[in-house]
Amino acid sequence: MTRSRAVLFDFDGTLADTAPDLAAAVNRMRRQHGQEPLPIERLRPFASAGARGLVHAAFGVKPEDPEYKALREAFLDFYAERVCHETRLFPGIDTLLAELRSRDIRWGIVTNKSTRFTEAICFSLKLKPDCLACGDTTPHLKPHPASLLHAAEQLELPPASCCYLGDDLRDMTAARAAGMRPIAVDWGYHHPDSGAPGTWNAETILAHPLDLIPHL
């Protein structure tokens, strides 16, 4: 097995728990429409799917529906106002990042989230990744491997020397297509359409961030 020279992370549900702020934005919309807010535990599984997932969870509206565009824009406007109010790193992530630094292993973020939101959260949480590839960095979103390959190019490393951590089937699909080591995490959001992590054909499933260390 090739030694990992870089660890790349999905963002929402893998590196950071962004669900509280995402849920707050969509519940603000529900109140505006005269509806009761939904409990965060009902919305959490859809957080990794961003606006598309949360608008559908809160209003039953899909991207092909005529009202979707307006709802999506309202959601993004509300989210932009409080993008990192309650967002935090998952427990153990800060310790893992420090361990990677001590081993001279580089790390980065590859996410379908837009650059403006990702950079704002990184600034608030004082994160300084070695590379960043967002949903608007390449023409394709995960599960297409383009953003993962872009990150490897930024690091000037072969994809095979990188592992990619994620909490969704699309993350593992993208990692395999990019030629990276696919590593699933058990602490994320796990969209109901993705099935259980054990069905994703990941190299391993981590119960805690520090469980990655023996696999480096």
Predicted regions and their residues:
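Asp-based, Mg2+/Mn2+-dependent phosphohydrolase catalytic module
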Residues: 1-5, 41, 101, 115-216
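Conserved SAM-binding loop
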Residues: 15, 89, 107-110, 140, ...
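Residue-level detector of anion-binding/catalytic polar loops
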Residues: 36, 106, 181
